[in-house]
Amino acid sequence: MDEDAESRVSSTRSYDRRGHLDWLRKLPDSLLCQVFLNLPTKDVVKTSVLSSTWGNIWRSVPGLDLGYGDFPEYNAFVSFVDSFLGFNSESRLQNFKLNYQYLRLKYEWKWTELDNANVTRWINTVIKRKVEHLHLSDVTFSNPESVSLPCVKVMYLDMVKFANDLAFEMLISGCPVLESLTIKRSACDNVDYLRVCSQSLLSFTLVGHCNEDMVKEQVVAIDAPRLEDLKLYCHETASFIIKNPASLVKMDIDIMFNLSSEQKFDPNDLPKRNMIRNFLLGISGVKEMEISSHTLEVIYNYSRCERLPVFRNLSSLHADFDDYRWEMLPGFSKTPGEEPISILPGPQCNLPALEFVDILKPMVEKETELKLMSYFLEKSTILKKLTLRLGDFRGNEESALLKKLLTIPRLSSSCQVVVL
């Protein structure tokens, strides 16, 4: 590229940047604040150098998002939060994200009563400003006399510690319009019986800790009659109790009920069997499910001594079968009124709701996996698309396999088979 061309390109880029900046400068402050709401507070403050009219606009953004490396020292952090919350104190605050975790790691201080007092004071302030999104990381809640978060719709608790079970329960019950709750647990959060009781909750995600040395058996109890989307990723929780599950639509589960290779499922443990039975019954009405190989193994072991429930509404299943348990799939899709469920795909039953099947693992065992393909194609009444992947086959083997696939009859006339 010659010098004139390079100069033209450079000028064009410079003009584009100026044009975008000029366009932003013309936006009204109210709209700018909504744009800046999606940025970390540190970056919003930096925008003050871009325009003389933006010097203090960061103070008017209806949200605070503070993280790692934002402050040279702890006192500066406290002073900044106080200053921000004190400005426009009568205006509504949409988001409040406070991350103590990285600050603690950076400055190596221990949690003190002063920290408790600061967090309590800030939360009381954002409550008055009708905060809707509350994101807290690595803070500690003392035992409150009462909790009232009347406007909080979204709550994210990351490694948050509580005085006891009751303190957590009061926090959740104090949010009458809560719609989305995400919890990433700490091994020392002081909550053994985690009870989520909410009349408004629509989505709940629970991520467990990685401490395999837990002695106490932890329990999670969910009573949320409007809950539609449930995600559980926690191996260490021993018991799950789901009340009022009728509204559940989607589930993503990676749980082991505190079982392991050392502590396997015991068919003589009747309380554990009853709990798993009730859990499976509670989730059997879902339409979409993702399930891990860990959970499938527990269910498989359970199914050898108890009948599995009917998942009559299931239309989408993403299952990680690892290297085994392909034969479990029919158990998730049986129609009502059949004989007790067999793990083998023998019974004559259709899949009335299944529309899409995507098998992510490449085919390597032709006979076993061809039976699986046959099951889906021959039993799915409204199947639209089946996608599969081939492993490393020789040319002749691959050609023979594809011919066999083409000869499998399809119950659904509109079904398309895609081979990747």
UniProtKB/Swiss-Prot annotation:
CDD domains: F-box_AtFBL13-like (cd22160). Pfam families: F-box, FBD, LRR_At5g56370. Residues 21-71 form the F-box domain. Residues 341-390 form the FBD domain. SMART domains: FBD (SM00579), FBOX (SM00256). This is Putative FBD-associated F-box protein At1g78730. It comes from Arabidopsis thaliana.
